[in-house]
Amino acid sequence: YCQKWMWTCDSKRKCCEDMVCQLWCKKRL
């Protein structure tokens, strides 16, 4: 289970299932 404020973007969690978090993750990095 994942929430917007929980997004970790790990290659193992694939950014919280189907949520579009890749873009957000890239920004964070």
UniProtKB/Swiss-Prot annotation:
GO MF term set: potassium channel regulator activity; sodium channel regulator activity; toxin activity
All disulfide bonds of the chain are 2-16, 9-21, 15-25
Where mainly found?
A: secreted
Q: Which UniProt keywords apply?
A: Disulfide bond, Ion channel impairing toxin, Knottin, Neurotoxin, Potassium channel impairing toxin, Secreted, Toxin, Voltage-gated potassium channel impairing toxin, Voltage-gated sodium channel impairing toxin
Q: Where in the cell is it found?
A: Secreted
Q: In which tissues is it expressed?
A: Expressed by the venom gland.
What is one term from the GO cellular component aspect held by the record? extracellular region
Q: Which residues form a coiled coil?
A: none
Q: Does the keyword Secreted apply?
A: yes
Extra facts = Negative results: does not inhibit sodium channels Nav1.5/SCN5A (IC(50)=22 uM) and potassium channels Kv11.2/KCNH6, Kv11.3/KCNH7, Kv1.1/KCNA1 and Kv1.4/KCNA4 (IC(50)>200 uM).
- Family in the record: Belongs to the neurotoxin 30 (phrixotoxin) family.
Please give the function described in this protein's UniProt entry.
Inhibits voltage-gated sodium channels Nav1.1/SCN1A (IC(50)=630 nM), Nav1.2/SCN2A (IC(50)=230 nM), Nav1.3/SCN3A (IC(50)=770 nM), Nav1.4/SCN4A (IC(50)=1290 nM), Nav1.6/SCN8A (IC(50)=630 nM), Nav1.7/SCN9A (IC(50)=15.3-1000 nM) and potassium channels Kv11.1/KCNH2 (IC(50)=4.2 uM).
According to the UniProt entry, the note on domains is: The presence of a 'disulfide through disulfide knot' structurally defines this protein as a knottin.
Q: Write down what this protein is called.
A: Beta-theraphotoxin-Gr1a
- Its source organism is Grammostola rosea
